[in-house]
């Protein structure tokens, strides 16, 4: 297994306490607390985290939930994973960000921070002197991503979305090992639909996305998706919890035989279809549905029923997610079409 050579080298190193901000976990212990995001040009916040330090050396895996405030299934799953992982049986370290975007979570806002109006997953690696979303990204980059060997950014359907389970794995062509291991951890998580991402930014100073920030630092990373309408439904909570435990067994961080890697369908060409206006959205397709080029995805009307736009598929493919809710702003997504490929 590709992770084993590194792990074998780590086994010769004595395990020591692991500190993230004010949180320190000694070998065989878990510890939780908050990373502070100081006030700056706007109000500050804090980030709830857990450090699980294994009794034996091994890799460090970062698990991030709550980047978007209403994507709650991963948040609940990480709470359960915190209790399920026995530090005495763990090799290595697990870093959990329980809710990356606490302002958005507490205000139940979709996509954007209620403080600065920015999408946290579009401002990485962040800035220490920026607005609150940028400062959150800076803290997560420096305290979590830079400390990890692997990363999973855990997303689900936001309050307006229906998302079939799938993962994004980068293939940026900068480091073959990182590209390959990113696909491997998507499979280890249990994903059977994987979008091969080839168009992310290559500049570490403008990485934009959580996953891409790790990838550009040569840390294998994926974005895990799946869920609907901001619900912590049991199926998606279990999907995420199972993914965590599968990955840790695959990396030999938890005892037990690793699960077989599943067969997967890969997608490369994708397009997010965006609304040309603001009004009431009437979708005509569902997530997972196959569509032909030019087929109707839905109709946007004005507030008095006048048709503003008929949105169509730009090419044939599969709907990876759709927005089934009526409220629609100009420039927001109505869905994403992806084309299956034979091999990554």
Located regions from the model:
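Sec-dependent N-terminal signal peptides
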Residues: 2-12
